[in-house]
Curated annotation (Swiss-Prot):
KW Oxidoreductase (keyword) present: yes
Reactions accelerated catalytically: 5-aminomethyl-2-thiouridine(34) in tRNA + S-adenosyl-L-methionine = 5-methylaminomethyl-2-thiouridine(34) in tRNA + S-adenosyl-L-homocysteine + H(+)
Keywords: Cytoplasm, FAD, Flavoprotein, Methyltransferase, Multifunctional enzyme, Oxidoreductase, S-adenosyl-L-methionine, Transferase, tRNA processing
Name of the protein: tRNA 5-methylaminomethyl-2-thiouridine biosynthesis bifunctional protein MnmC
GO terms, molecular function: flavin adenine dinucleotide binding; oxidoreductase activity, acting on the CH-NH group of donors; tRNA (5-methylaminomethyl-2-thiouridylate)(34)-methyltransferase activity
InterPro entries in the record: FAD-dep_OxRdtase (IPR006076), FAD/NAD-bd_sf (IPR036188), MnmC-like_methylTransf (IPR008471), SAM-dependent_MTases_sf (IPR029063), tRNA_MAMT_biosynth_bifunc_MnmC (IPR023032), tRNA_MNMC2 (IPR047785), tRNA_S-uridine_synth_MnmC_C (IPR017610)
GO cellular component entries: cytoplasm
Pfam families for this protein: DAO, Methyltransf_30
Annotated HAMAP family: MnmC
Signal peptide (from-to): none
Region (FAD-dependent cmnm(5)s(2)U34 oxidoreductase): 270-668
Amino acid sequence: MKHYAIQPANLEFNAEGTPVSRDFDDVYFSNDNGLEETRYVFLGGNQLEVRFPEHPHPLFVVAESGFGTGLNFLTLWQAFDQFREAHPQAQLQRLHFISFEKFPLTRADLALAHLHWPELTPWAEQLQAQWPMPLPGCHRLLLDEGRVTLDLWFGDINELTSQLDDSLNQKVDAWFLDGFAPAKNPDMWTQNLFNAMARLARPGGTLATFTSAGFVRRGLQEAGFTMQKRKGFGRKREMLCGVMEQALPLPCSTPWFNRTGSSKREAAIIGGGIASALLSLALLRRGWQVTLYCADEAPALGASGNRQGALYPLLSKHDEALNRFFSNAFTFARRFYDSLPVKFDHDWCSVTQLGWDEKSQHKIAQMLSMDLPADLAVAVGANEVEGVTGVVTNCGGITYPQGGWLCPAELTRSVLELAQQQGLQIRYQHQLQDLSRKDDGWLLNFAGDQQATHSVVVLANGHQISRFSQTSSLPVYSVAGQVSHIPTTPELAKLKQVLCYDGYLTPQNPANQHHCIGASYHRGSEDTAYSEDDQQQNRQRLIDCFPQAQWAKEVDVSEKEARCGVRCATRDHLPMVGNVPDYEATLVEYASLAEQKDKAVSAPVYDDLFMLAALGSRGLCSAPLCAEILAAQMSDEPIPMDASTLAALNPNRLWVRKLLKGKAVKAG
């Protein structure tokens, strides 16, 4: 059975107030002056004070072994802010810090440790506010309005480095080789780690470490670094520094899932919903010029136009990729929404998923057996539900404490207004008819004989994604659904959380005293006309799931208030994020893939054509992380996801899985 909770650090604080690991019998930082040691060993050892002003790129990437209390990160962040203040016109504008931690501190222990360094308080408080829950994998934190990115990888560094996507290869400008002393934690200091550091290091990239142990120096040399000794900090006689003089050969183990970015920084996004809005922000943060083409006269008139949508993860005991993606997508979404400097109706009131029949009870029991962190999900008994949710249901379930509801339409509009302030250009009433390569870019033909050319194009237009020749074979489908808007009642007004059953019911929105109940499900349909049958079915499903609940019978749908939308979905319930694959070329190039994996070429795709689609019914949960993943890929930056989960998001995945097994592939 796979367990999803990460063990927190087992520590105590000594007489000096320094945290000490009970498991490794070692301090997290020097009792004497940990802050000055960090500045000397890691910032000085990597010559960052000299390199920052001379860096020829807008992004500087630092990787670290062992996040611990975050002292190295906070010290670097402080130094980076000082650099930006002194050199506002420098090419370098953003800092990206990647760190691996097997036993993360609790938020409380982190805050206690940070009391040691009052001068770092402004940065430490921001880190504490976004400190993630103990889930395995990558947690991306966007700090200082996106100028600083922190990727926290929770798990064993030697296991994680073998799971990294190729997007991290040759990206690291400086390594902080830190952690408990080699004698205290020999399992970390391995040749496997040294080789991974070399693989991730950019040509000209450097490393620094506090130790001068001979096996560490020899291991790093064997990996490809040129090493030298330097005077150690304080009473330590020596430390090690190194440089990666030249690029190492980097074979790709899964070329069929390879992701390519773009050397250009100008893009058109086709869409008008939450996916295109969030992608616009993510690209603008990276310095792109972005134009959004929306088919309607205003944004959020499609699937993103609902009054209330539930935010909670999609979990399944039997699907590793689904769990890894949605658990991290959910926590990223909460951090992202909380940090957005815009207003939109929302209430993080929690979500309770109820076991209303034997099948749903079994599913919930399986989820609870995965040892999920209590911050993510907790069991709630039938006798506890009324106290938690405010209404009687006579069944137990699982509660997502950090879940809730938000208004997708308001969110989309507010994000686009923010993006326009940052330079986004929007063209409404532009219905894309087709697109084709022209010179080194794309020619877009819109209805009404309107045309435009752009270097890069992203399709983020929901269920209309497959209407073009390049995307017509994608295995996606449309789902039409109707959400009913119902007036509150004295009993319904007691509902404190979002309820999920064979449908969902939101607490009332104070802005209109209405609840949302839904949604009907019509696979393969794009019909958005009001349906009285759907209206009655939404009510009846609630009554059928809670037959003894009088409040359910009082639900009134007679006002005929509803909203109909169309979602885009996939068979495996995961989004499609990445390059648009070339279907015909994939079948030709991979005709013998099952027998000739070692000879496979990189996945056939359309150059500079990307997609963000098939968010299904969990778009509010998945869209922020999907936008971040795609923007990072397009910009050739580190992607915050492991290789196997990224493969599960690749738009070509359903074809490639069959081809790897020697099975025939059909379009659609």
